[in-house]
Swiss-Prot record:
Keywords: Cytoplasm, Methyltransferase, rRNA processing, S-adenosyl-L-methionine, Transferase. Belongs to the methyltransferase superfamily. RNA methyltransferase RsmG family. The gene is rsmG. GO terms for cellular component: cytosol. S-adenosyl-L-methionine binds at G81, M86, V132, E133, R147. It comes from Pseudomonas fluorescens (strain ATCC BAA-477 / NRRL B-23932 / Pf-5). The lineage of its organism: Bacteria, Pseudomonadati, Pseudomonadota, Gammaproteobacteria, Pseudomonadales. Its main location: cytoplasm. This is Ribosomal RNA small subunit methyltransferase G. InterPro entries: rRNA_ssu_MeTfrase_G, SAM-dependent_MTases_sf. Pfam families: GidB.
Amino acid sequence: MSSMVTPQHADELSTGARQLGVELSPTQHQLLLGYLALLIKWNKAYNLTAVRDPDEMVSRHLLDSLSVMSFIENGCWLDVGSGGGMPGIPLAILFPESQVTCLDSNGKKTRFLTQVKLELKLENLQVIHSRVEAFTPEQPFNGIISRAFSSMENFTSWTRHLGDRDTRWLAMKGVHPSDELLALPADFHLDSEHALAVPGCQGQRHLLILRRTA
Protein backbone atom coordinates (compact mmCIF):
# COMPACT_ATOMS: atom_id res chain seq x y z
CA MET A 1 0.00 0.00 0.00
CA SER A 2 1.30 3.45 -0.88
CA SER A 3 2.45 5.58 2.03
CA MET A 4 -0.11 8.16 0.91
CA VAL A 5 -2.92 5.67 1.52
CA THR A 6 -3.35 4.86 5.21
CA PRO A 7 -4.94 1.91 7.02
CA GLN A 8 -7.72 4.33 7.96
CA HIS A 9 -8.45 4.90 4.27
CA ALA A 10 -8.58 1.13 3.74
CA ASP A 11 -10.96 0.67 6.67
CA GLU A 12 -13.17 3.56 5.55
CA LEU A 13 -13.44 2.04 2.08
CA SER A 14 -14.31 -1.42 3.43
CA THR A 15 -16.88 -0.11 5.90
CA GLY A 16 -18.45 2.32 3.45
CA ALA A 17 -18.75 -0.30 0.73
CA ARG A 18 -20.53 -2.65 3.14
CA GLN A 19 -22.93 0.12 4.12
CA LEU A 20 -23.69 0.62 0.43
CA GLY A 21 -24.29 -3.09 -0.04
CA VAL A 22 -21.27 -3.44 -2.32
CA GLU A 23 -19.24 -6.61 -1.86
CA LEU A 24 -15.59 -5.88 -2.65
CA SER A 25 -13.24 -8.77 -3.32
CA PRO A 26 -9.73 -8.40 -1.85
CA THR A 27 -8.45 -7.67 -5.36
CA GLN A 28 -11.06 -4.97 -5.97
CA HIS A 29 -10.31 -3.41 -2.58
CA GLN A 30 -6.61 -3.24 -3.41
CA LEU A 31 -7.25 -1.85 -6.90
CA LEU A 32 -9.46 0.92 -5.50
CA LEU A 33 -6.77 1.82 -2.97
CA GLY A 34 -4.19 1.76 -5.77
CA TYR A 35 -6.37 4.15 -7.74
CA LEU A 36 -6.68 6.38 -4.67
CA ALA A 37 -2.89 6.47 -4.31
CA LEU A 38 -2.47 7.52 -7.95
CA LEU A 39 -5.19 10.14 -7.59
CA ILE A 40 -3.48 11.65 -4.53
CA LYS A 41 -0.08 11.62 -6.25
CA TRP A 42 -1.12 13.07 -9.61
CA ASN A 43 -3.63 15.57 -8.24
CA LYS A 44 -0.81 17.73 -6.90
CA ALA A 45 0.48 18.47 -10.39
CA TYR A 46 -2.51 17.81 -12.63
CA ASN A 47 -5.37 19.41 -10.68
CA LEU A 48 -7.61 16.40 -11.24
CA THR A 49 -10.08 17.23 -8.48
CA ALA A 50 -10.89 20.15 -6.22
CA VAL A 51 -10.79 17.74 -3.27
CA ARG A 52 -7.26 18.21 -1.92
CA ASP A 53 -7.49 16.33 1.36
CA PRO A 54 -6.79 12.60 0.89
CA ASP A 55 -8.97 11.90 3.92
CA GLU A 56 -11.97 13.24 1.98
CA MET A 57 -11.27 11.35 -1.23
CA VAL A 58 -12.52 7.97 0.00
CA SER A 59 -16.02 9.26 0.72
CA ARG A 60 -16.35 12.00 -1.89
CA HIS A 61 -14.85 10.04 -4.77
CA LEU A 62 -14.64 6.30 -4.14
CA LEU A 63 -17.78 5.77 -2.07
CA ASP A 64 -19.72 8.31 -4.11
CA SER A 65 -18.86 6.27 -7.20
CA LEU A 66 -19.71 2.98 -5.49
CA SER A 67 -23.13 4.34 -4.48
CA VAL A 68 -24.45 3.84 -8.04
CA MET A 69 -22.98 0.39 -8.68
CA SER A 70 -26.19 -1.45 -7.80
CA PHE A 71 -27.77 0.27 -10.82
CA ILE A 72 -25.03 -0.90 -13.20
CA GLU A 73 -25.28 -4.01 -15.36
CA ASN A 74 -22.55 -5.71 -17.36
CA GLY A 75 -22.09 -4.28 -20.83
CA CYS A 76 -20.35 -1.46 -22.66
CA TRP A 77 -20.26 1.74 -20.60
CA LEU A 78 -19.17 5.31 -21.29
CA ASP A 79 -18.13 7.75 -18.55
CA VAL A 80 -18.55 11.20 -20.10
CA GLY A 81 -16.36 14.03 -18.84
CA SER A 82 -14.57 11.44 -16.73
CA GLY A 83 -12.06 13.92 -15.29
CA GLY A 84 -10.10 12.08 -12.62
CA GLY A 85 -11.93 8.85 -13.42
CA MET A 86 -15.10 8.97 -11.37
CA PRO A 87 -17.12 6.84 -11.67
CA GLY A 88 -15.48 5.14 -14.66
CA ILE A 89 -12.42 3.69 -12.91
CA PRO A 90 -14.39 2.17 -9.99
CA LEU A 91 -16.92 0.86 -12.53
CA ALA A 92 -14.13 -0.87 -14.49
CA ILE A 93 -12.74 -2.36 -11.27
CA LEU A 94 -16.08 -3.69 -10.02
CA PHE A 95 -17.26 -4.95 -13.42
CA PRO A 96 -14.22 -6.63 -15.01
CA GLU A 97 -16.47 -8.35 -17.58
CA SER A 98 -17.71 -4.96 -18.83
CA GLN A 99 -16.00 -2.68 -21.32
CA VAL A 100 -15.63 0.81 -19.86
CA THR A 101 -14.64 3.92 -21.82
CA CYS A 102 -13.53 7.07 -19.98
CA LEU A 103 -13.80 10.13 -22.21
CA ASP A 104 -12.50 13.62 -21.48
CA SER A 105 -11.40 16.59 -23.57
CA ASN A 106 -8.63 17.55 -21.12
CA GLY A 107 -5.31 16.02 -22.15
CA LYS A 108 -3.83 16.08 -18.66
CA LYS A 109 -6.76 14.12 -17.31
CA THR A 110 -6.68 11.51 -20.06
CA ARG A 111 -2.93 11.08 -19.52
CA PHE A 112 -3.67 10.38 -15.87
CA LEU A 113 -6.42 7.92 -16.77
CA THR A 114 -4.06 6.14 -19.16
CA GLN A 115 -1.51 5.86 -16.35
CA VAL A 116 -4.19 4.35 -14.09
CA LYS A 117 -5.08 1.83 -16.79
CA LEU A 118 -1.43 0.81 -17.18
CA GLU A 119 -0.46 0.68 -13.51
CA LEU A 120 -3.60 -1.14 -12.36
CA LYS A 121 -3.65 -3.34 -15.49
CA LEU A 122 -7.30 -2.57 -16.25
CA GLU A 123 -7.61 -4.38 -19.57
CA ASN A 124 -11.33 -3.62 -19.80
CA LEU A 125 -10.73 0.15 -19.71
CA GLN A 126 -10.40 2.41 -22.74
CA VAL A 127 -9.35 6.06 -22.44
CA ILE A 128 -10.42 8.54 -25.12
CA HIS A 129 -9.12 12.12 -25.42
CA SER A 130 -11.88 13.90 -27.33
CA ARG A 131 -14.78 16.27 -27.11
CA VAL A 132 -17.90 14.21 -26.65
CA GLU A 133 -19.56 15.72 -29.74
CA ALA A 134 -16.66 14.54 -31.92
CA PHE A 135 -16.50 10.99 -30.57
CA THR A 136 -17.99 8.22 -32.71
CA PRO A 137 -18.00 4.70 -31.24
CA GLU A 138 -18.22 1.52 -33.30
CA GLN A 139 -21.56 0.66 -31.71
CA PRO A 140 -24.02 2.24 -29.26
CA PHE A 141 -23.19 2.00 -25.57
CA ASN A 142 -25.40 0.03 -23.19
CA GLY A 143 -24.97 2.75 -20.58
CA ILE A 144 -23.72 6.33 -20.51
CA ILE A 145 -22.93 7.86 -17.13
CA SER A 146 -21.83 11.29 -15.96
CA ARG A 147 -20.90 12.78 -12.61
CA ALA A 148 -21.02 16.57 -12.27
CA PHE A 149 -20.46 16.83 -16.03
CA SER A 150 -22.98 19.41 -17.23
CA SER A 151 -26.69 20.14 -17.23
CA MET A 152 -28.92 17.21 -18.06
CA GLU A 153 -29.98 18.98 -21.24
CA ASN A 154 -26.37 19.16 -22.42
CA PHE A 155 -25.56 15.67 -21.15
CA THR A 156 -28.34 14.10 -23.20
CA SER A 157 -28.01 16.35 -26.27
CA TRP A 158 -24.26 15.92 -26.56
CA THR A 159 -24.37 12.13 -26.12
CA ARG A 160 -27.54 11.33 -28.07
CA HIS A 161 -25.50 9.89 -30.97
CA LEU A 162 -23.66 7.51 -28.62
CA GLY A 163 -26.69 5.46 -27.61
CA ASP A 164 -30.02 4.13 -28.84
CA ARG A 165 -33.42 3.23 -27.40
CA ASP A 166 -31.89 0.37 -25.40
CA THR A 167 -29.25 2.63 -23.79
CA ARG A 168 -29.62 3.93 -20.25
CA TRP A 169 -28.29 7.39 -19.40
CA LEU A 170 -27.28 7.74 -15.72
CA ALA A 171 -26.82 11.26 -14.35
CA MET A 172 -25.19 11.56 -10.91
CA LYS A 173 -26.35 14.77 -9.25
CA GLY A 174 -26.28 16.51 -5.90
CA VAL A 175 -29.49 18.41 -5.18
CA HIS A 176 -32.44 17.03 -7.15
CA PRO A 177 -32.29 18.80 -10.56
CA SER A 178 -36.00 19.54 -10.97
CA ASP A 179 -35.42 22.50 -13.28
CA GLU A 180 -33.00 20.53 -15.45
CA LEU A 181 -35.57 17.77 -15.92
CA LEU A 182 -38.01 20.30 -17.33
CA ALA A 183 -35.45 21.19 -19.99
CA LEU A 184 -34.81 17.62 -21.17
CA PRO A 185 -34.90 17.17 -24.96
CA ALA A 186 -38.25 15.90 -26.21
CA ASP A 187 -36.83 12.51 -27.19
CA PHE A 188 -35.64 11.71 -23.65
CA HIS A 189 -37.70 10.73 -20.62
CA LEU A 190 -36.98 10.05 -16.95
CA ASP A 191 -37.05 6.30 -16.37
CA SER A 192 -36.37 6.36 -12.62
CA GLU A 193 -34.76 8.47 -9.91
CA HIS A 194 -33.05 7.47 -6.69
CA ALA A 195 -31.92 9.36 -3.59
CA LEU A 196 -28.49 8.11 -2.53
CA ALA A 197 -26.89 8.03 0.91
CA VAL A 198 -23.09 8.09 0.65
CA PRO A 199 -21.21 7.22 3.87
CA GLY A 200 -19.15 10.18 5.03
CA CYS A 201 -20.73 12.65 2.60
CA GLN A 202 -22.94 15.51 3.67
CA GLY A 203 -25.58 16.97 1.39
CA GLN A 204 -27.94 15.44 -1.11
CA ARG A 205 -27.06 12.87 -3.76
CA HIS A 206 -29.35 11.72 -6.53
CA LEU A 207 -29.14 9.35 -9.46
CA LEU A 208 -31.43 9.94 -12.42
CA ILE A 209 -31.83 7.25 -15.08
CA LEU A 210 -32.98 8.37 -18.50
CA ARG A 211 -33.93 6.68 -21.75
CA ARG A 212 -34.59 7.80 -25.28
CA THR A 213 -38.11 7.63 -26.60
CA ALA A 214 -37.04 7.76 -30.24
